[in-house]
Regions:
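Residues within the helices of the helix-turn-helix
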Residues: 21
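Ser/Thr-rich, Proline-interspersed low-complexity disordered segments
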Residues: 40-113
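Secretory targeting signals
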Residues: 1-18, 30
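N-terminal and secondary-structure boundary signal
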Residues: 2, 6, 24-27, 33, ...
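Intrinsically disordered, low-complexity regions of eukaryotic proteins
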Residues: 8-11, 24, 53
């Protein structure tokens, strides 16, 4: 297990940089794929995702700390006052650099020819290691395996949800892993299957509040077992600086995001989220999990804020308009290839103990899919909510429906009639959650 942190944590091993041979091989493959896509009438809109990134101008010898101070903060537009449209925003001002190799095109888009997106469900009562592994294996098998997602030698990143920091505790004596953060046994099970599929390198990533989140919440032990590298996305390690990654087609709030370069250099990106309600977004699953991709320091209204307050804006009203759009923009900039949602033991009424209505619930369920929008839609329905609900209605009581925005952006489908559920039905696993309305 390797540790890559914003802090001065010792580093056992750094991920390899692309060799010239690998660069040429991947560039050639990308060019061939583009040529093929141009010849195919039904090419997915996601083929344009992960556009060229531009590095900041910090010297290559800079440390993570100096890189952070030299990287210009991102700019965002004012909150739109009408439904989302493809309006222009302020162009990025980062210094241009040679084009980076694009990541693999997501396989999570609705299939052509009327085929429905598939989402797998598994009923499971606890986090017993063998049972979790068997459940995840069964779901992956029902989705056709990982062969169309992970290819031999691929570099794969798993984004976990470790929100809030270790000072926060679970309700009623439950651990955070059994309430508001991704359970490590779910990460372990998927990681083992990814390695079985031939992955050449595995990374577990999150913009953690502190490194202790990895240690105390089980990911450090899982990374050691898997031979994976842990990376704190708040910093630049193991690279000299951040990259600016464009939002394909532009965004309504942000035109680009500042990322740790690992998010661009990987071949496959997976989201392992917790099944929860959310104060601003209504629900938080695979798509919302990507809020934790960006370094918090660049997305604060004031330096004193510990969270990404610039995403929210000054009020709940602005947050309800901004955050759903930003969720979609992040998913366009860094698409998800495979989504897994931990709903075995979780919380209702809010995303964490800082929400007054937060409390425990044990649905005993897992969800998986290659269409992250569909996967989130099924999880939302299993919470007793309508994934197509209009803005300002339950569960999206404070703003826009980010599932609808994601579907409109071509990231997947949120309509249950367009989704084929594998395993138990939604009604079989449905457990009505208290929404975050207090």
């Amino acid at each position: 297990m390797n540790k890559i942190s914003e802090s001065s944590e010792p580093q056992v091993q750094r991920p390899r940089r692309l060799s010239r041979r690998d660069f040429l091989r991947l560039a050639g493959a990308a060019a061939a794929g583009l040529a093929l896509a141009r010849c195919t009438p039904s090419a997915s809109p996601a083929a344009q995702l992960m556009e060229t990134a531009t590095a900041t101008s910090v010297p290559s010898t800079a440390t993570a700390t100096t890189a952070a101070s030299a990287t210009p903060p991102p700019t965002s537009t004012a909150v739109p006052t009408s439904p989302p449209t493809a309006t222009g925003v302020v162009p990025a001002t980062a210094t241009p650099s040679p084009a980076a190799v694009a990541t693999a095109v997501p396989t999570a888009q609705p299939q052509a020819g009327g085929a429905r997106s598939k989402v797998a469900i598994a009923s499971i009562r606890d986090y017993d290691r063998a049972r979790v592994r068997a459940a995840v294996q069964e779901m992956v098998d029902s989705l056709g395996g990982l062969g169309d997602v992970v290819r031999p030698g691929d570099r794969v990143a798993i984004k976990v949800n470790l929100t809030g920091g270790v000072g926060n505790k679970g309700p009623d004596g439950l651990s955070p892993m059994e309430s508001f953060v991704t359970h490590p046994e779910v990460v372990r099970a998927l990681g083992e299957l990814v390695l079985d599929a031939g992955a050449g390198a595995l990374f577990i990533v999150e913009a953690v509040y502190q490194w202790a989140s990895y240690t105390e919440w089980g990911c450090e032990e899982v990374a050691r077992h898997l031979g994976a590298t842990l990376i704190d996305l708040n910093g630049t390690d193991p690279y000299p600086d951040y990259v600016h990654v464009a939002v394909p087609g532009g965004g309504e709030i942000y035109n680009e995001f500042i990322f740790n370069p690992i998010l661009q250099e990987i071949d496959v990106f997976m989201s392992v989220a917790k099944m929860k309600c959310h104060w601003v977004a209504g629900v938080t699953h695979s798509l919302k999990n990507l809020i934790g991709l960006v370094p918090a320091r660049f997305y604060r209204l004031t330096p004193e804020h510990s969270h990404r307050s610039a995403f929210h804006g000054p009020t709940d009203e602005t947050a309800g308009q901004r955050v759903p759009r930003i969720i979609v923009e992040l998913n366009k900039a860094r698409p998800i290839h495979f989504a897994l949602i931990d709903g075995i033991k979780t919380t209702e009424g809010g995303e964490g103990p800082w929400i007054r209505t937060f409390g425990p619930i044990a649905p005993g369920v897992l969800f998986a899919g290659k269409d992250p929008v569909a996967t989130d839609a099924v999880a939302t329905a299993a919470q007793g909510f309508d994934p197509t609900a209009p803005p300002m209605t339950v569960p999206f009581v404070r703003g826009l429906n980010h599932l609808a925005l994601a579907a409109a952006a071509g990231l997947g489908t949120h309509r249950l009639e367009e989704i084929e559920v594998m395993g138990p039905s939604i009604e079989d696993v449905r457990r009505d959650f208290r929404p975050c309305v207090g």
